[in-house]
């Protein structure tokens, strides 16, 4: 299994990017997340209608693929082929970190099995936010 985390995306560095998205305020996205999403050939979205709000705000024009709990198994072979053909593919959820109470775990497991790079892009965290205001 190859898991990488780098501060700057190199040109044409393919793999599956797990990109965290804002939990409430669209301005809470990181610069790195925007950079990765703009360089992605494809963005896998839990709900393209919800994701479009975020992507439009930051002028991100990557191709969208709907990837939710009802079609993620069906999409799996197509997405793996994209990743094997050196495409940059990002996975986002409607809010927060993909694969945590969201679709994506099946794809991540398949990438691990196929030795495809997985690059996490951290972002806002409900846990750290809750802890910070707990006193």
Predicted segments with their positions:
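Glycine-rich, highly charged phosphate/nucleotide-binding loops
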Residues: 71-79
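Glycine-rich, flexible N-terminal cofactor/catalytic loop recognition
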Residues: 2-70
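Short, glycine/charged-enriched secondary-structure capping and boundary segments
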Residues: 32-35, 57-60, 79-81, 103-108, ...
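Short glycine-cluster motifs
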Residues: 85-135
């Amino acid at each position: 299994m190859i898991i990488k985390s780098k501060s700057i995306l190199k040109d044409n560095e393919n793999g599956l990017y797990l990109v965290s998205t804002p939990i409430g305020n669209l301005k809470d996205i990181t610069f790195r997340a925007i950079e990765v999403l703009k360089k992605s050939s494809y963005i896998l979205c839990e709900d393209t209608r919800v994701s479009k709000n975020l992507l439009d705000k930051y002028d991100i024009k990557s191709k969208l693929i709907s990837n939710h709990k009802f079609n993620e198994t069906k999409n799996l072979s197509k997405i793996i082929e994209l990743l094997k053909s050196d495409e940059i593919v990002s996975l986002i959820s409607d809010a927060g970190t993909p694969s945590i109470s969201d679709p994506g775990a099946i794809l991540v497991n398949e990438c691990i099995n196929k030795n495809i790079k997985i690059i996490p892009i951290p972002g806002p965290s409900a846990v750290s936010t809750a802890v910070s205001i707990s006193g």
